[in-house]
């Protein structure tokens, strides 16, 4: 299992950050590995929303099927990966002084045997950490 956690602090209050994060279709604008998002549910926000996210890391491409499992405006968004790669993740927002917000993105991912299973997770973790760190920098720039 790959376990990842990245954080950044942005120059905006949690409600402003949430307004941006709540637009799931815009995640391709800041997530380094996200290429396209296609909703598979009629709703596009809130718990129960489902979508397919085409991802690309280097030469590797796959479609990540996800479901929003938690939706607490201004606080947290949870996701469950239900495709080839399974697991769960959470983006949490915490108010900081001077109207800033700390964003923490945590994921636990399980890779199928043909992607190396636990060994693949060990190899993928530092690569994914770098990709998600870059994504957090992109997200921070949206509030600069």
Range-by-range predicted roles:
Residues 5-7, 63-65, 88-90, 106:
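Well-ordered beta-strand positions in beta-sheet-rich domains
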Residues 80-134:
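Beta-strand/loop substructures that line and gate deep hydrophobic ligand-binding cavities in soluble
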Residues 19-26, 133, 137, 141:
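Short, intrinsically disordered, mixed-charge
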Residues 19-34, 48-60, 127:
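Short, solvent-exposed helix-to-loop capping segments enriched in aromatics
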Residues 1-40:
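Hydrophobic ligand-binding cavity/cleft-lining segments
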Residues 38-88, 97-100, 134-144:
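Glycine-rich portal/gate segments that line the openings of hydrophobic small-molecule binding cavities
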Residues 9-13, 54-58, 69, 94-96, ...:
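Solvent-exposed residues in well-ordered beta-strands and their adjoining turns
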